[in-house]
Amino acid sequence: MTELEGAVFTDEAGHTLYTWPQHLLRNGYSGEQKGRIECYDIVRTKTAGLMSPYPPGVLLPELDTRPSCTDLWRPVLVLEGAEPIGKWSIVEGQDGRRQWAYDEQPVYTSHLDQEPGDTTGGTKRRYGGEGAAARNPIGPPPRVPPAFRVMTTAHGGLVMTRDARSVYILNGESEGQIRCTGDCLDSWQPLTAPALARGDGLFSLVERSPGVRQWAFRGQPLYTYSLDSGEDWMVGSDVSGWSNVYLWETPEPPEEFTAQDTIAGQVLADAQGRTIYLYSCGDDSIDQLGCDHPTDPQVYRLAICGRGDPEVCQENWHYVPAKDDAESGSRAWRAVWIDPMTGRFSDAGVEGAMRVWAYRDRPVYTYFLDEKPGDVRGDATGEWRGGRNGLKAYWIRNAYFRGQ
């Protein structure tokens, strides 16, 4: 079980397994079709032209040290004598390798994952056409009855109905203490179960009234909310006493971080209330390699945050400092040493190095134009509103994106 993605498949060393599903970009597709390997030991030197307005054929940065796709994404090779089973099959590459595939998608591990349970290489969370074709962790289907599904969010595995309605519990309610009655039922609909339904895992059935059975999670009856007007909405969690349901929950940020209300929802902020921003980036090579980790080329980030000048970048976007003894208690949040002039990892004691907070191994920032708690003036800075190469606020709750 991982902190951010729930249950995942791993190799024998505990490294998370990923696939690279084909993804529609602005000028074509990238990623891998089912049954076809596209990630090879070839160093790509030019852009593919998949993201307008950039043309194909432009030289990529740092070619003298540029890795190949398989340097960063290691194929999970088939050992002699192994046989396909279930959704696990074998695909053959143009280089003759035999590689495991899950649901026909070739499987890899990430060079960024250092310990069992790490998912630094990618996420199951959905993303739009502005971002690069991402690698996704794979795992077993969540253990939920057929009436439910689970979506990975910033808070954890959000439990929803099969038609993507959020479900809720009322604090203090249990099978023997049904509190939502009378006028409460005008807004909250009990999630009733058919006659042949059976409990499974953390899900059970409680008798709401003679002959009427209601789904429950950890013994607490489940409801939907009438004002959730679309898929994935979470408006009901704003009502006192009501909470969303998560199959697993992500770890809390370090204790010095705070939550702040904005005109568009709620964001994570530092101890002074300044909004926290995350940087994301994917290059325009056919391999769609990442460029947002301290081990990646920094020219993309420097272009966005400071017109190529690291000093201007630091004036505009401030690293969030961490104390020398700072600890978070999780792998998702870590205090790391960074050289602010290069953006790369450094060591304690190196002149100019800073100890800063990082999320998923990537430093987080505040923005110089945010003057008071709740300001989000740096949100969507960069290419395609920050989705391709840029910075976005760390949204705890975004009212314009259904609360996620």
Please provide the spans of the model-predicted regions.
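Compact beta-sheet-dominated domain cores in extracellular/mature segments
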Residues: 1-404
